[in-house]
C-alpha cells in the first residue's frame, strides 16, 4: 500500500486560487504584476465596495414587502462578506507564516498511525466542501428561479442603479449582468471566508491527534533519547498555539509549534468569525419572519427556506472543529502521562511536569475576543435568532 504523503498545504490550494481571482494575492503573482494590481483595484471597487452600496441605497424603498426583505438579507450578507474579505486581505501575509509552521509540523509526522490520522483529514474536508456546495446551490437555484418567474421586468436582487434599467432594454441587461457577475464574485469571497477557518481548525485538530500519538510513544524506544523527543513535542504544541494564532526534545519542540500556530490562526479568523456569528443570527431571524408573516410567492418562500437553513450551516463546520480543538488540547496532559515517564531521569520528569502545567491552560479560539468558536456559540447564535424573532412577533401584536 502506498504511503500517505503528508502535505497540509494541499488543502490551501483552492483558497489561494480564490484569493488570486479576488485580487488579494498580489505578492504571489510574478508575471504581469502591475496588470494584476490594476485588476485588483477595479474589481474590488466595483464589487467589494459598490455591490453592498447599490443594495443598501434601495433599503425599504422597493415595491413590495418581499422585495424589501430580500434586499435587506442580501445587503446584510454582502456587507459582511465584503468586510470579511477586506480583513482577510489585510492580514493575508499571515497565511504564509501558517504555512511555514505547518511544514514544520508535517516534517514531524512519522509512522502509520499518524499518517492514518492525516488521511482522515481528506475525508473531513471533503465533507466540509459538500456542506458548502449544499448551502450555495439551492439558494442560488431558487434565487434565479424567483427572478426568472417574475411577471414583470425586475432585477435578481432589488437594488439601486444610477440609470433607468426599467424602461431601457440595454440598461436592463447591464444591470442584470452586473448583479450576476457581482454576486458570483461575492459568493467566491463568502466561500473562502467561511471555509478557510474550518480548514485550518480541522488541520489543527489532526495535528493535535498526531502529537498525542507521539507523546504516547515517548520513552518506548530505548534507542532514542526520550528527553529530546519530549522537548520536540512541546515545541510542536507551542507552534500550533501560535498558528491559530532526542524523544523529550522533539515532544517539547512539537508543543511549541502548536502554540504558535493556534495563536496565529485565532488572530487571523477572529474578527471575520465575529461578523459571521452576528450576521447569521440577524439573517436567520429575518428569513423566518419573512416565511411566517410576509412572503407568499412559492419561489420566494423556497428561497427563504433554504436561505434560513444555509446561514447556520455556514458557521457549523468552524464551530465543530473549534470544539474538536478544545477537546484534544484538553487531553494532551493525559498523553504526557501515557508515555514511559516513570523510568526516565529527573530532568525528563521536570520538563514533563512543566509541559503538563502549560497544557492545562484552556486553549479555545475566540471570535473578536468575546465569542468562542465552539458548538456552544453555534447554538447560542440560533437562540439569538429566535429571541429576535420573538421580538418581531410581539411588535406585530
UniProtKB/Swiss-Prot annotation:
Entries under InterPro entries matching the protein: 7tm6_olfct_rcpt
Keyword Cell membrane in annotation: yes
Residues glycosylated per entry: 62
Gene Ontology molecular-function annotations: ionotropic olfactory receptor activity; odorant binding; olfactory receptor activity
Pfam families: 7tm_6
Location of the protein in the cell: Cell membrane
Record membrane topology: Multi-pass membrane protein
Expression by tissue: Expressed in neurons of the third antennal segment.
Family: Belongs to the insect chemoreceptor superfamily. Heteromeric odorant receptor channel (TC 1.A.69) family. Or2a subfamily.
Protein name: Odorant receptor 59a
The species this protein was found in: Drosophila melanogaster (Fruit fly)
